[in-house]
Structure formats: structure tokens, C-alpha cells
């Protein structure tokens, strides 16, 4: 769903930080 996609994107950004 939309939330899953947003969460996955946020996790990527946090992991790259």
C-alpha cells in the first residue's frame, strides 16, 4: 500500500544517513 511504500523509502534514507 501507500504507507508501505513511504515507509520503505524512509528506511532507505535513514539507512543511508
Curated annotation (Swiss-Prot):
Coiled coil: none
Entry annotated with the keyword Ribosomal protein: no
Positions bearing 4-carboxyglutamate: 3-4, 6, 9, 13
Subcellular location: Secreted
UniProt note on tissues of expression: Expressed by the venom duct.
Example of a GO MF term: toxin activity
GO cellular component, one term: extracellular region
UniProt entry keywords in alphabetical sequence: Gamma-carboxyglutamic acid, Ion channel impairing toxin, Ionotropic glutamate receptor inhibitor, Neurotoxin, Postsynaptic neurotoxin, Secreted, Toxin
Main location: secreted
Miscellaneous note of the record: The mature peptide does not contain cysteine residue.
Function of the molecule: Conantokins inhibit N-methyl-D-aspartate (NMDA) receptors.
Descriptive protein name: Conantokin-Qu
Amino acid at each position: 500500500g501507500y504507507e508501505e511504500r513511504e515507509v520503505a523509502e524512509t528506511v532507505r534514507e535513514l539507512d543511508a544517513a
